[in-house]
A protein has these predicted regions:
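Mature catalytic domains of secreted/periplasmic carbohydrate-active enzymes
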Residues: 1-140, 145-163, 172-184
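Exposed beta-strand face motif in extracellular beta-rich ectodomains
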Residues: 167-169
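Short beta-strand edge segments in extracellular beta-sheet folds
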Residues: 187-188
């Protein structure tokens, strides 16, 4: 929990992973009349980014029909969701990484248009980051704040409101508990 929530607590501490449960449909069970109401791939992708990219696991219910099979509408949206997630992952921008004290810098070989930043703590070391500021820069210009995050954990996907073109992305951890361990930091092409 937050430092404020823990201030007056003297018992043992435990970390529990967050979990997001939803269904491909508006309910948990299959009804033939709902085959045209399966959630869209864009809605499911948004839920995936918000859950997996929000330090949680994503449990997606796909209800079988009365024959024990998945409806074609569900299978189609799952295939398209898989393609969309694969596309997101394939847009990782190659960069060199420099770690120094509380700052991680990604340097690109040329200006790149960035649509998201992914931060991942080494959970084996604990969830420690309370706040981080993400800035971008094109060589020869000043730093520009593009995002501020509270809590990173397993994975934080920071989708930028507006893509930025940069030669460098910098993540500055401004508050943490006993240091921090960023297992991975990368930018995703817009």
């Amino acid at each position: 929990g937050s430092r404020e929530a823990l201030a007056d607590y003297s018992g043992p501490l435990a970390w529990y992973p967050a979990e997001v449960n939803t269904s491909t449909r508006k309910g948990w069970f299959h009804h033939d009349v709902e085959d045209s109401q399966v959630r869209s791939v864009d809605e499911l992708f948004s839920i995936w980014k918000g859950s997996v990219g929000g330090n949680a696991t994503f449990l997606l219910n796909v209800p079988p029909n009365r024959d024990g099979l998945l409806a074609d509408a569900d299978v189609e949206v799952l295939a398209r969701l898989g393609e969309k997630i694969a596309d997101f992952r394939s847009r990782r921008i190659e960069a060199s990484r420099e770690d120094e004290a509380n700052v991680v810098t990604l340097r690109f070989d040329a200006p790149r248009t960035v649509g998201a930043i992914v931060l991942e703590e080494d959970i084996a070391q604990g969830q420690r980051i309370d706040e981080a500021v993400v800035t971008s820069c094109v060589e020869g210009t000043g730093e520009q704040e593009i995002a501020r995050v509270h809590c990173v954990g397993y994975r934080r996907i920071v989708t930028l409101e507006k893509p930025v073109t940069a030669t460098r992305i910098r993540v500055t951890v401004t508050a943490s508990r006993q240091g921090f361990y960023l297992a991975d930091v990368y930018a995703v092409r817009a």
